[in-house]
Amino acid sequence: MPVKPNFNPDYLYFVTTSAVKHVHLFRQDVIKRIIVDSLYHLRTTRQMELFVFVIMPNHVHIIVHFSEEYPLSDVMRDFKKFTARQIYRQFQADGNTRILDVLSREGERVKLEYKVWDDGYDARDVYSIEFLQQKMD
């Protein structure tokens, strides 16, 4: 997914980020909790206003407002880095070798120990109430 090149702190954004290879990593409640806890943490530490989020089996949608001090790219980097580490550790603790093999194999391609998220993210300006309502439904 491409990174949004221009960031306007006056806008709300509809952001989507996906699991590597669109693998269904986010089915377990414990994995969802890692994502939710991280989003709530970013609300306070990165002055991010979180309006709505939904966790699908292989991707996450969020509607957020970011501050100038902590732009979208920085927040997404921190979110993905932290959650990747926690999600990988959880799969290790669970002994889920099938998922660990996929994450390790994808990591090797880019000279990392593992890879949980696809590169980049998609961010769209929430340009109207209708667009916002459509994404919230």
Regions found by a protein language model. Give the residues of each.
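Short catalytic/metal-binding and nucleic-acid-binding patches
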Residues: M1-D137
